[in-house]
Structure formats: structure tokens, C-alpha cells
């Protein structure tokens, strides 16, 4: 398959806007790496640079040991799936699948073999003779993926391919893409702003912010040990709760003597213990502001002094607005960050 290497990639437009700044990234052979970040962070631009649709200002791009900076998009052996399905409306599904292969003068028998294989993988055999307008959104996206599969490229690029689908279909397609990529073993880069997609699909995640990589790791590593406050706040639904250490010590008299340098503390909503357990960690006496049922329990927004926390509990609260709620955060479940730099100070 292929190894993608990006070395010191910089992209700056003529108006001076810096989109990507000295970015380094390696995607392993057969890996599915997800680029996740907020809108405008540079993740789609990076994908377009790899595809050859945009030029870098500086830096080197390699697939395996081959430098591809100056190669035309058609010569990079890359296939890309876009947010909009980019299907030819006047062609049948079969026509869309075979179009690129015909342009490359692929033998007819080989075209038929590849289409049959892709259609079976994607379960689209029954509508090969339909036009795109006769298909649902999910079916159109399968056809779009079929177009890249029949190419048999070294690299797949996915640019937010599921953003036009509803939540249920998006979840289903996530599973299908992951299963498909594993079965094909094609090195893949996938762009999304949806952290749930990223956590579901990725072998590894690269969290992008303002054109730079904040952290790279497996989904579990990113969730359990965020390296910056940006990652801690961006990954997780709900995100982490943040609290100034000095405020905690002033109001609760609870001292984190094991890490004097720490300015900022954070904890996940699900790690709290309902009730008062002062031997395990600081106890917060809060007031319920909002309850968000999640089926198995609820997310509860609580007020502590001037701070709003979100906690996750297994109980199903209903009309408890304004009531008092006490909970404990075990000290081993606190993450610690430097408030000035945003960098992690210790693992927990």
C-alpha cells in the first residue's frame, strides 16, 4: 500500500493568511488516520494539498519514498471522496463507477471485474442501472466510495463525506467505512469536525488547531490523556470541566500539594462520585441548573460559585431544577494543565 509523509508543510495565501504552519505528519501503511478540528483549522486544506488540488508554500510531501510535490493530481495515485457526492447526474451508477476507468483506458473485462467487486463490497448491486436522483443520501455516498474503490489507488482521502447525512445514517456509514477500509487495507486520511466520527473511525487521531497539530494518538490516548487544554475541551461530549486550582483551594481549602506548579485542573463529566467522600477528593456542593436526559441517565449542568460544571450521572432526574447536588471528584481523576501555555503538567 503506502506510507504518507508530510515534512514541514506550510501554506500561506497571497493575502498573508497562514493556514498551515510547519506541520509534520506520517500516516502508516494501511492506517486510517483522522484529522479532526473546528471549522477553519486547515484540515481540509491539508487534504487538498496531499491530493494536489492546492500547492504548498514550503515543505515536502512523500508517498512511500517518492516526492510528489510537483506531480499532477492525476499522477499521484490518490482517490478522494468529497462532502458533496460529485456524481454525474446523467449517468447511471454503473456509468459513474466506470467513467474514470474508461478514461484511463482500462480493459473492459477489468472494469467489469472491479465494478462487480466494489458493488458487492458496498451492497449496491441492485441499483447499478439507476440514476443518482433515484438514490437516497446513503446510497449516493456508497456510490461515491465505489468510485474511489474501483480506482484501486495507493491512498484514500475522505473530506467530511458524511456531513450531509442524518445522525442515524452517519453512524451506520461510519461503521461501513471502517469495515471497508480494514478489508481493503488502503492507507487513508479522513477529515471531519465531528469528534464522534473521529473516535469511531480512527486508528489514530490528529487534532488540528489553527493549522498546527495539537496531539496525535489513538482515540483512547486522546481521550484519556489530552496534551493541551484545547484537546481536553474539544474531545469529549460533554467536554472536560476546567477549574482554577487557586479558586478550588480558596473555596474548599483543598490543596493539591503533589503538583504545586499546576494552575488549571480538569475532570471528565463521568468520573465524579455522587455524594460526599472527602477522603477520596474535593467535595462540591452545587445547584442544578439544567438537566439533559441521555436515556441511560443524564448530563447535569450544576453551578458551583460562579463556575458551571457538567456531570454525567446514571440516575434519571426530572424536575430537580434548583435543587442542591453534592459530588466528589477523586483526586486521581484530575488532569492538570499550565494555565498560561495550555500544556499538560502531569498524566492525572
Curated annotation (Swiss-Prot):
The keyword Oxidoreductase does not apply. Keywords: ATP-binding, Cell inner membrane, Cell membrane, Membrane, Nucleotide-binding, Sugar transport, Translocase, Transport. InterPro entries: AAA+_ATPase, ABC_transporter-like_ATP-bd, ABC_transporter-like_CS, ABC_transpr_MalK-like, ABC_transpr_MalK/UgpC-like, Mo/tungstate-bd_C_term_dom, NA-bd_OB-fold, P-loop_NTPase. It catalyses: sn-glycerol 3-phosphate(out) + ATP + H2O = sn-glycerol 3-phosphate(in) + ADP + phosphate + H(+). Residues 4-235 form the ABC transporter domain. It holds the Pfam family ABC_tran. It comes from the Bacteria. GO terms for biological process: carbohydrate transport; glycerophosphodiester transmembrane transport. It is found in: Cell inner membrane. It is a peripheral membrane protein. One of its GO terms (molecular function) is ATP hydrolysis activity. It is an enzyme of class 7 (translocase). One of its GO terms (cellular component) is ATP-binding cassette (ABC) transporter complex, substrate-binding subunit-containing. Its EC number is 7.6.2.10. ATP binds at residues 37-44. CDD domains: ABC_MalK_N. Belongs to the ABC transporter superfamily. sn-glycerol-3-phosphate importer (TC 3.A.1.1.3) family. The complex is composed of two ATP-binding proteins (UgpC), two transmembrane proteins (UgpA and UgpE) and a solute-binding protein (UgpB). PANTHER family: MALTODEXTRIN IMPORT ATP-BINDING PROTEIN MSMX, SN-GLYCEROL-3-PHOSPHATE IMPORT ATP-BINDING PROTEIN UGPC. Part of the ABC transporter complex UgpBAEC involved in sn-glycerol-3-phosphate (G3P) import. Responsible for energy coupling to the transport system. This is sn-glycerol-3-phosphate import ATP-binding protein UgpC.
